[in-house]
């Protein structure tokens, strides 16, 4: 059997995975900033790295999986001030919501889930090491900054050079910085900020910059050199680039061996963005779709590829998952142990060992389901159920799932038909120049979570929001 190979962003290639310590894997994934509900992009990060850690454990590794929580940040402070509540009240509420969303999606809790505010001393300790090593300075405005030009390998993860970055500079000018690209390690507290947003230090009262949080938590919990660091593609630069610069300048050694990044989530082929009003929270999605369907939708795309979210694609995922459960409906699985020597299991394992290639692994499940349908073989049914379980799927009683799925499909079809009927009524109102009625129908649909977009030629498209 092939060894596990992982696409390493640092090397820009697949590499055979060899842990630093035989049989042990230490992995850190950047988690959420808890000032709002988690969105579909967060769901992808959680599902992708849940599958990664599940597969590493399946291979027999002793895994320590850390996924942090950022609970101090400018966005958090602004939201708490807007709401008139404390930082802790706000972050506790959204951490609870995060856990509810993750549990619904079948995400196994990380072994360690550190909050940034519990590691302020470690962050300050790393900043002091950077200052002692000549990589940090306190500016005239009180902020402590990282001197990017001092780190010779800056840009090695993203492939960006300092010259290219300066040529395309979009960072707001700050006369206190030695270089516009320098980034903040410790932010000086401002008089108007709430008292619960700062900590005393030798640099004055303030709070950590975002990048130093992950460096300090990773090094403290997993050691100064560990195996895997993961996160969304959007974090590759500058966040992960800055983590490398901080950590390696502080410790004098390699920070991480393998860097993994999952692809963007797109909404109807456009990048998900609040500015485009195509932004969906996990709870909005789960109000409409079964959580296992959403997990399956994410799992059957390769983690490095863009993921296009749409009602059509989710409906397709529901139908596909239904086919897998249908194969198990009338066949009782024989036994509770996976036979890894069986041909389908061997192919599944080969796919997962090829950079966690879940699309191929899922295709093996469908071939196996077809064979179960043909033979009614309890041993093959066992293989199907247990291989699905490896990636967090097919854990429910088939008839219960199928009954629920049939009901959801019927409701979805009825809703779609009702929406189309309202669109037709709106078109008729416009034709009759009753624009008040047409606007009223649009408003009613929007209140029901359906946005309309008029296209050339009199066509109207709709989507759920």
Curated annotation (Swiss-Prot):
- Where located? Cytoplasm
Q: Where is this protein chiefly located?
A: cytoplasm
Q: Name one GO biological process term.
A: cysteinyl-tRNA aminoacylation
Q: Where is this motif: 'KMSKS' region?
A: 271-275
Q: Which InterPro entries match?
A: Cys-tRNA-ligase (IPR015803), Cys-tRNA-synt_Ia_DALR (IPR015273), Cys-tRNA/MSH_ligase (IPR024909), CysS_C (IPR056411), Rossmann-like_a/b/a_fold (IPR014729), tRNA-synt_1_cat_dom (IPR032678), tRNAsynth_Ia_anticodon-bd (IPR009080)
Reactions listed under catalytic activity: tRNA(Cys) + L-cysteine + ATP = L-cysteinyl-tRNA(Cys) + AMP + diphosphate
The GO terms describing molecular function are: ATP binding; cysteine-tRNA ligase activity; zinc ion binding
Q: Where does ATP bind?
A: 274
- Protein keywords: Aminoacyl-tRNA synthetase, ATP-binding, Cytoplasm, Ligase, Metal-binding, Nucleotide-binding, Protein biosynthesis, Zinc
Q: Which domain of life is it from?
A: Bacteria
Would you indicate the residue range of the signal peptide? none
Q: How does it assemble?
A: Monomer.
Name by which UniProt lists this protein: Cysteine--tRNA ligase
Q: Which organism is it from?
A: Paraburkholderia xenovorans (strain LB400)
Encoding gene per record: cysS
């Amino acid at each position: 059997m092939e060894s596990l190979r992982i696409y390493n962003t640092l090397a820009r290639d697949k590499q055979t995975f060899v842990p630093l310590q035989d049989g042990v894997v230490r992995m850190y994934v950047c988690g959420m900033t808890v000032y709002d509900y988690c969105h579909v992009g967060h769901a992808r990060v959680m599902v992708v790295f849940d599958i990664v850690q599940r597969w590493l454990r399946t291979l027999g590794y002793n895994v320590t999986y850390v996924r942090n929580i950022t609970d101090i940040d400018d966005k958090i402070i602004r939201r708490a001030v807007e709401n008139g509540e404390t930082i802790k009240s706000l972050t506790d509420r959204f951490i609870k919501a995060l856990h509810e969303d993750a549990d619904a999606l079948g995400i196994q809790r990380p072994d360690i889930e550190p909050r940034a505010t519990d590691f302020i001393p470690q962050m300050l300790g790393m900043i002091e090491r950077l200052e002692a090593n000549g990589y940090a300075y306190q500016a005239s405005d009180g902020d402590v900054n990282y001197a990017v030009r001092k780190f010779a390998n800056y840009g090695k993860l993203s492939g960006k050079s300092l010259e290219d970055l300066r040529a395309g500079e979009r960072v707001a000018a700050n006369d206190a910085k030695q270089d516009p690209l320098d980034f903040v390690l410790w932010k000086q507290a401002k008089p108007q900020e709430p008292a619960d947003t700062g900590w005393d230090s030798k640099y004055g009262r303030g709070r950590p910059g975002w990048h130093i949080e992950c460096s300090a938590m990773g090094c403290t919990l997993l050691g100064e050199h560990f195996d895997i660091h993961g996160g969304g593609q959007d974090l590759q630069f500058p966040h992960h680039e800055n983590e490398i610069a901080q950590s390696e300048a502080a410790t004098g050694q390699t920070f991480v061996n393998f860097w993994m990044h999952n692809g963007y989530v797109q909404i109807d082929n456009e990048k998900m963005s609040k500015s485009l009003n195509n932004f969906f929270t996990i709870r909005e999605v789960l109000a409409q779709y079964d959580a296992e369907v959403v997990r399956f939708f994410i799992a059957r795309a390769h983690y490095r590829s863009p993921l296009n979210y749409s009602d059509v694609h989710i409906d397709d995922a529901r139908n596909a998952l239904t086919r897998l459960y249908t194969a198990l409906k009338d066949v009782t699985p024989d036994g509770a142990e996976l036979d890894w020597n069986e041909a389908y299991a061997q192919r599944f394992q080969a796919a997962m060992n090829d950079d966690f290639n879940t699309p191929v692994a899922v295709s093996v499940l469908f071939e196996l389901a077809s064979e179960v349908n043909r033979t009614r073989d309890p041993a093959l049914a066992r293989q199907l159920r247990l291989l699905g379980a490896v990636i967090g799927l097919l854990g429910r009683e088939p008839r219960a799932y199928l009954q629920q799925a049939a009901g959801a499909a019927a409701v979805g079809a009825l809703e779609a038909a009702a929406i189309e009927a309202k669109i037709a009524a709106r078109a008729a109102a416009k034709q009759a120049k009753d624009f008040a009625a047409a606007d009223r129908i649009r408003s009613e649909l929007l209140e029901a979570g359906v946005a309309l977009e008029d296209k050339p030629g009199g066509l109207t498209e709709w989507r759920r929001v």
